[in-house]
């Protein structure tokens, strides 16, 4: 596995002790949010008025990951902030049994239909990007356009040896071991050193890493374990041609790994089957683009949202 795929693998697989989150740039002020709506698998808050933009964070990450973009985005948009139950240390709800990703999609669709948000712009980071693709596949009318931030239609390609076409069946046994190891950490204290180990390489700024460590320690490892397992065995590559909503793939690069020359071809290969896809790259950034380059990320996000 080369250093580029290793970095992405860490972003998805690192939680073998407790798990990395993806975290956003924190603004000094925040838009006023509505009261929280709790559902079986997610909770939702809203801010602002205008055309709807749904923000879905990644594995073991609270909605606060988007704090740095919400104030500006809410000036012209109705911002819907999703949080997976248990990822912020809250009640896990129905997320302690299999089918979490499908449950998230079901809850999102129900919220969109009830609140007349069909055709919304949807943004998902890491695991949230996978959920966005699942939503577009299952409920195409829900999504007007989709932004995928440093995510893949099949995360397990990162574990494939050169020349091997990996399948969910091949990955499932190892994914199950990872799930069980993570779940077994529930209720056990995690040291700062362990947290640092799990967040290493996912952002470039020291203050970002500090926030990531705090969030990693707060997430319910039982939920993290199940969602990680489902991430690894979910393969949407063959579904890409049927996703008609325009897709924007936003990915990072830096002077180490991945370089711009490495990242571009890799992502284009993963999304080659999508009929309507554009690519946006942000340099001097790692997996948590919104932390490393908050201004560039906000600019790309507002351009996407319209």
Give short role names for the model-derived ranges:
Residues 157-163, 181-241:
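Conserved alpha/beta-hydrolase catalytic His-Asp/Glu region
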Residues 40, 45-94:
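Conserved HGGG/HGGXW glycine-rich cap/lid loop of the alpha/beta-hydrolase fold
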Residues 2-54, 74-78, 117-118, 275-278, ...:
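Alpha/beta-hydrolase fold catalytic core
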Residues 246-285:
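Conserved loop-alpha-helix segment in the C-terminal half of the alpha/beta-hydrolase fold
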């Amino acid at each position: 596995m080369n250093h580029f795929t290793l970095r992405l693998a860490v972003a998805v697989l690192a939680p073998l002790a407790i798990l990395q989150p993806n975290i956003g740039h924190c603004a000094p002020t925040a838009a006023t949010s509505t009261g929280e709506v709790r559902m079986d698998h997610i909770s939702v808050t809203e801010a602002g008025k205008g055309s709807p933009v749904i923000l879905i964070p990644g594995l073991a990450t609270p909605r606060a990951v988007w704090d740095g973009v919400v104030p500006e985005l809410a000036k012209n948009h109705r911002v819907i902030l999703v949080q997976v139950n248990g990822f912020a240390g809250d009640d896990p709800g129905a997320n302690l049994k299999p089918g979490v990703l499908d449950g998230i999609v079901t809850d999102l669709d129900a919220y969109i239909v009830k609140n007349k948000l069909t055709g919304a712009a949807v943004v998902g980071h890491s695991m949230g990007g996978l959920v966005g693709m699942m939503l577009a596949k299952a409920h195409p009318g829900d999504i007007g356009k989709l932004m995928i931030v440093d995510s893949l239609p099949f995360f397990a390609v990162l574990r494939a040896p050169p020349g091997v076409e990996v399948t969910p069946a091949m990955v499932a046994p190892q994914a199950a071991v990872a799930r069980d190891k993570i779940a077994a950490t529930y209720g056990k204290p995690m040291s700062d050193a362990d947290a640092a180990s799990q967040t290493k390489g996912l952002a470039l700024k020291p203050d970002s890493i500090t926030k990531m460590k705090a969030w990693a320690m707060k997430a319910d490892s039982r939920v993290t374990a199940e969602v990680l397992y489902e991430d690894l065995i979910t393969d949407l590559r063959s579904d890409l041609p049927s996703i008609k909503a325009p897709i924007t793939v936003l990915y990072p690069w830096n002077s180490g790994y991945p370089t711009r020359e490495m990242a571009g071809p890799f992502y284009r290969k993963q999304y080659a089957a999508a009929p309507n896809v554009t690519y946006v790259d942000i340099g001097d950034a790692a997996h948590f683009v919104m932390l490393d380059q908050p201004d560039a990320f906000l600019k790309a996000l507002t351009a996407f949202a319209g």
